[in-house]
């Protein structure tokens, strides 16, 4: 049951071979046993989860079950969840019980899925290793000396360790795809605007996007069928006809043109990552695809551009956390201004403070034109790079991360090295494109390697087809870490 797909679990539930209460109990038992070691969950609420499972069993018994009814799903602790502690990995929200559900939570509630728990994450989604969480670092289940990636490290760890069959994540610069790669699971960042951001605590609003994390591409499609959809409460939500993202999974890949950016295959990639990625691309050739070289000339600028734009938006978004209406408030202060200063100084961690300072600096008088405006111009050029590349190919591929998971603490004292962990994922967010990572092997110290698959706007069904066809010929996505 631990390795069963979402489709298989849904079929078992529909056929009454197992109840949602039994299924949820099994995953809760496993989560409670493993969480002290991995720290994947911030909150587990057994009573609420089992109550949802009981309600799901009633739905299924009355013939009103849908795909994912009764299936336990782990939710990243960035999504507001009514009646649940919603911390965003921060001391600032360590006492915040959300009074409402985020769009994503509401969509899963509507189909009768079970919320098995809220997963750990980098504070306010700012990090690439899940070491900035107020609740402590998450450990990689393949090697507990290694990071799981971030910021959705808790979700990636929970799925990889089979503490949950699937999870939600968010991706601002790679925060679904990078931890998916480092933990050996599949993760999808949809086209910007496809999944509503309502109730998703904001980091950088023009870059943030929610998405699914699961063992396989097929599971991602089933999750996206629930998560995607127009929401009038989010001004950036796209009004599109609903579609079945699993519809093309079995389509053969004959004639598929795979673009290989020359900027992605450079000496900075670790040899073990390069070998696994090249072997996967070779398998695609056997499946009937052809490869063409393309160029994304502004790729090298994606990290500096991102670290101007994302902190600028964060400095504005995080100004709302002041201790007045909700969240942490400093216990001792002289006056209102002193309360603001002490609350934010004590409530935010060092990485969040660093990005607020950077963002405030680049938006300040005298630097706005030199940094922020120039970064926006380069962002447009990166989108144009992808548009030109997609004239030559259908899908773009490369490594998700330049290395396998690095050791805990290895980069925490060097922010620039940490930021470079997302060198291959950031440009996708700047362009608003969809992209995903799937496991394609193992490298140094038996740590997983991920293949990055980038599609054109709204090409999620095609990307899932491309990933699924590879997974029919491989078993990397079915492998479990040793306990």
Curated annotation (Swiss-Prot):
Gene3D superfamilies tied to this protein: Amidase signature (AS) domain
Active site (catalytic residues): 76 (charge relay system), 151 (charge relay system), 175 (acyl-ester intermediate)
Alphabetical keyword list: ATP-binding, Ligase, Nucleotide-binding, Protein biosynthesis
EC number: 6.3.5.7
Pfam families associated with the record: Amidase (PF01425)
UniProt catalytic activity: L-glutamyl-tRNA(Gln) + L-glutamine + ATP + H2O = L-glutaminyl-tRNA(Gln) + L-glutamate + ADP + phosphate + H(+)
Any single biological process term in GO: translation
Top-rank lineage group of the source organism: Bacteria
InterPro entries documented for this protein: Amidase, Amidase_CS, Amidase_dom, AS_sf, GatA
Gene Ontology MF annotations: ATP binding; glutaminyl-tRNA synthase (glutamine-hydrolyzing) activity
One Gene Ontology cellular component annotation held by this UniProt entry: glutamyl-tRNA(Gln) amidotransferase complex
Annotated family: Belongs to the amidase family. GatA subfamily.
Functional summary from the UniProt entry: Allows the formation of correctly charged Gln-tRNA(Gln) through the transamidation of misacylated Glu-tRNA(Gln) in organisms which lack glutaminyl-tRNA synthetase. The reaction takes place in the presence of glutamine and ATP through an activated gamma-phospho-Glu-tRNA(Gln).
Subunit structure and binding partners: Heterotrimer of A, B and C subunits.
Name of the protein described by the UniProt record: Glutamyl-tRNA(Gln) amidotransferase subunit A
Organism the protein comes from: Nitrosospira multiformis (strain ATCC 25196 / NCIMB 11849 / C 71)
